[in-house]
């Protein structure tokens, strides 16, 4: 497999000109609240959402209080694909995106007439930071014969350079379709997800060498030891994880697919290799089942994330209330970039809608499950 670059950095400038590295992100995580403070803030936010004609769109990885608040107020808690669809289709005047910056940008691109706010504009993503648009554009220019496919975890400027945008829940299907049509691909930025898809589809993929700070820290050796400690447990793995971790999985899939697996599989215990923020929704969806965090560090080692994204952790009730009260932290995307970026996003959404119709028409649910099932050494 060819490589685009040898390494990436997590402390690079954002496309928008701001910067917030790992250390800065952890320093900006709001302090925990006392129960009475939390209840008061939730009541205040509910009133502000009504006043501002706003809806809360939250990712599975943010704080459990934010997820619960989104559910309680008619908002959305979902993966990035469903967040994009929900924000586009909802009639709210204001979308409040609890997640990371690329999610807010995508919401604005799909809903240019709506106001899009975020609790903290510095909440970014290591994959975004590791794929600066100027370097990526130069790489694409060097391979003009290839179709450019970028993961959702990229800036609007990088999406504007792409032919397709994908999420982990539909990326395999889209790449398989492109491969069937004989297209060669540039893939960015996550090398682990790209490698997983390449192995599943056999597609000719030239990889950008980015990685997710959280998933890159999961360890295959330690996971194998944990599996032997809990032999009855099923292992659920997000495909942004390293190959050695994916190889041990019973189910490999997006956040939504992992939650579905926790509900549908008859196991009572699961080892989960993704951001621990997902455990809130898993416990709600599968009450009575036990969820164990996969290890993120080896013997005597430390972890940068400890299975939780520092930028996701920057989202909290306190800064959400402040944003709604003051109307700041609004997302803007330059018109020319937004216009170009919308094309690959719309292509993905249209493909996903057609794929869903095909699956429903055929009733071929086993095929969908097989696409994200681990087969031996993945």
UniProtKB/Swiss-Prot annotation:
EC category: transferase
Subcellular location: Cytoplasm
Major localisation: cytoplasm
Co-factor binding details: Binds 1 [4Fe-4S] cluster per subunit.
Binding residue positions for iminosuccinate: 59, 80, 151-153, 168, 238-240, 255
Domain of life of the source: Bacteria
Family matches, as HAMAP family: NadA_type1
Protein name as catalogued: Quinolinate synthase
Annotated gene: nadA
């Amino acid at each position: 497999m060819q490589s685009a670059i040898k390494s990436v950095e997590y402390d690079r400038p954002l496309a928008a000109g701001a910067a917030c590295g790992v250390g800065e992100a952890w320093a900006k995580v709001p302090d925990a609240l006392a129960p009475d403070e939390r209840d008061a803030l939730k009541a205040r936010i509910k009133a502000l959402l009504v006043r501002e004609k706003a809806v809360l769109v939250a990712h599975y990885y943010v704080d459990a209080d934010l997820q619960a608040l989104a559910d309680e107020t008619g908002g959305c808690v979902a993966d990035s694909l469903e967040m994009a669809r929900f924000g586009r289709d909802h009639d709210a005047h204001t979308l409040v995106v609890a997640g990371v910056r690329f999610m807010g940008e995508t919401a604005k691109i799909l809903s240019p007439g709506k106001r899009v706010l975020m609790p903290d504009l510095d909440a970014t993503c290591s994959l975004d930071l590791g794929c600066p648009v100027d370097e990526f554009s130069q790489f694409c220019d060097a391979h003009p014969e290839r179709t450019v496919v970028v993961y959702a975890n990229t800036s609007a400027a990088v999406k504007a350079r792409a032919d397709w945008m994908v999420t982990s829940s539909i990326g395999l299907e889209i790449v398989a379709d492109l491969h069937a049509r004989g297209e060669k691909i540039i893939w960015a930025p996550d090398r682990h997800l790209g490698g997983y898809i390449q192995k599943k589809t056999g597609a000719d993929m030239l990889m950008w060498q980015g990685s997710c700070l959280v998933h890159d820290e999961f360890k295959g050796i330690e996971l194998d030891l944990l599996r032997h400690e809990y032999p009855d447990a099923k292992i659920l793995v997000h495909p942004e994880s390293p190959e050695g971790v994916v190889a041990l999985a019973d189910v490999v899939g997006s956040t939504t697919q992992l939650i579905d697996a926790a509900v549908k599989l008859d196991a009572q215990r699961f080892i989960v290799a993704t951001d621990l923020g997902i455990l809130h929704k898993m416990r709600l969806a599968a009450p009575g089942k036990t969820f164990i965090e996969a290890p993120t560090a080896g013997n005597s080692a430390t972890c940068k994330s400890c299975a939780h994204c520092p930028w996701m952790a920057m989202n909290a009730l306190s800064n959400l209330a402040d944003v709604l009260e003051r109307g700041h932290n609004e997302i803007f995307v330059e018109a020319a970039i937004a216009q170009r970026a919308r094309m690959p996003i719309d292509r993905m959404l249209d493909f996903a809608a057609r794929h869903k119709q095909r699956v429903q028409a055929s009733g071929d649910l086993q095929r969908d499950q097989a696409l994200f099932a681990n087969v031996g050494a993945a």
